[in-house]
A protein has these predicted regions:
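Primary detection of the long, small/polar-rich alpha-helical "axial" segments characteristic
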Residues: 1-487
Length: 487
């Protein structure tokens, strides 16, 4: 209360001024909330709420950038997929060229022309691999390895991707071939001949030590392993079957065949012996001459799976296309002997023997072989690349068909991987959008102003301000009346 009659101190006016100042601050705060839509625009408004809001804001910014990163990744992968599609189309053309060249009806000039076309096509495959880029980053030359896409707001929220080298020199058939019987898998041979018949199977310098059973394993560079126990009597077909049983997880396939070339000499009674393929019944052969011998063997092919052919030199070739062992037993007339250094013998006596075959492991990707030396397999596959195909000969064209087959398989596998990754990124984008929506909602709860409530509070503050001004005016009226007493 002011001192009566004082014109120097007006407590009522001071109270009114203080109230007006407080209401003015409230007005400013409420007007700021209305103009910005935020109840927290600085730490002064609500320190704890401000910290929470900043945390949500940081998370939301990270999510927004992660969505952008993922969309960029999708664009990159679409670029790589488009290039792979072009390469696959070119390799399909190479397949047609190889099949055409394998027909055997081409002249030497036509074969050379086909090889020229093949060279151009393989060069185009390599050109696509070396020139495909995204933002100056090479995608298909093998350098795009273990690249991380940051697809989340936090550390470690990444998707990793590698794209192999798809140049013509880097794709094709990865293979390892073994000829059974090359390393200690048969007994010392008996080269005797007699009037009653003999069988001479073997090769110069053939091993005579006892075979030790082993487990051969194979591991693909793309992951996945398989193994098979190999015994002394194992056929190439059984090894191939074991390999193919795991091809779904390893990508490694196997082909088996058994073939042996023999010199056939008729005895006093022509040829008399028994012939059997692994798992088939024994067939008795009684032939007067080599021509009759071939006819009889081929007549039993449906049972034994063994075919016979005579070459221009008179050599007899026996083939079991599935890689089953060829068992020759009970020779009583005539003689058979391997030519050259064909190392395909399991065991021999004067009158019987078993011929093992070859098994070839093959894949579009590289692979390693454990204990492979026990059956003649190398420790790692050898690449027969698309760049090395030669379709100028029928034999080369047939090899090219297989190389092209696995080159296509490799490209298709890469395309499948690239096709799956954009789907993963798209799913991640959808999840991030949902997360961003929820974080935005939570941020709004923390910092957004309640406009109806703020409007009501502002109206109240404005009324209080008007009342304060009226009170201030009233409190100064009495002070002014004292001045009328002055003379």
């Amino acid at each position: 209360m002011s001192a009566i009659g004082s014109i120097l101190t007006n407590t009522g006016a001071l109270d009114s001024l203080n109230a007006i100042s407080n209401v003015s601050n409230t007005n400013n705060t409420l007007e700021s909330e209305l103009s910005t839509g935020l109840s927290i625009s600085s730490p002064a408004n609500n320190p704890a709420g401000y910290i929470t809001a900043q945390g949500f804001t940081s998370q939301l910014n990270g999510i927004t950038q992660a969505i952008s990163n993922a969309n960029t990744g999708v664009s990159l992968l679409q670029t790589a997929q488009g290039a792979l599609t072009q390469q696959i189309g070119v390799v399909q053309q190479l397949n047609s060229i190889a099949v055409q060249a394998a027909n055997g009806t081409q002249t030497s000039q036509e074969a050379a022309s086909l090889q020229g076309v093949a060279n151009q096509l393989t060069s185009q495959v390599s050109t696509i691999a070396s020139q495909t880029q995204f933002n100056n980053i090479n995608l298909l030359d093998g350098s795009f390895s273990n690249v991380q896409f940051q697809v989340g707001a936090n550390e470690g929220q990444t998707i990793s991707l590698s794209i192999g080298n798809t140049s013509a020199a880097s794709i094709g058939l990865n293979a390892s071939k073994a000829s059974f019987g090359t390393t200690g898998v048969y007994n010392s041979k008996d080269n005797a001949s007699s009037a009653s018949g003999a069988l001479t199977l073997g090769a110069p310098g053939a091993a005579t030590g006892a075979f030790t059973a082993a487990t051969v394993s194979w591991t693909s560079n793309n992951g996945g392993t398989g193994s098979a126990a190999v015994t002394k009597n194992e056929s190439a077909a059984s090894i191939a079957s074991a390999v193919n049983a795991t091809s779904g997880s390893t990508g490694v396939q196997a082909q088996a065949t058994t073939s042996v070339t023999l010199t056939a000499t008729a005895g006093a009674s022509g040829f008399a012996f028994s012939l059997q393929g692994s798992g088939s019944s024994k067939q008795t052969i009684n032939a007067q001459n080599v021509s009759d011998l071939v006819q009889q063997i081929n007549g039993d092919t449906g049972t034994t799976g063994i075919t016979a052919a005579i070459d221009s030199s008179g050599n007899l070739t026996l083939t079991q296309s599935q890689g089953q062992n060829i068992n020759i037993t009970g020779i009583t007339s005539g003689s058979l002997a391997t030519t050259g250094s064909t190392p395909k013998v399991l065991s021999t006596t004067n009158a019987s023997g078993t011929v093992q075959g070859q098994v070839q492991l093959q894949s579009s990707a590289g692979f390693k072989v454990g204990n492979g030396s026990d059956i003649g397999l190398g420790s790692a596959s050898t690449l027969h690349s698309l760049a090395s195909i030669n379709v100028s000969t029928v034999a080369g064209a047939n090899e090219a068909i297989n190389v092209v087959k696995f080159a296509l398989q490799g490209l298709n596998n890469a395309g499948g991987q690239l096709g799956a990754t954009p789907q993963r990124l798209t799913a991640n984008i959808n999840n991030l959008n949902t997360t961003a929506e929820n974080v935005t909602s939570a941020l709004g709860v923390v910092q957004d102003a309640n406009i109806p409530q703020v409007s009501n509070q502002l109206t109240q503050a404005q009324i209080q301000a008007q009342a304060g001004v009226a009170a201030l005016k009233s409190s100064t009226t009495l002070q002014q009346s004292y001045l009328s007493l002055l003379p």
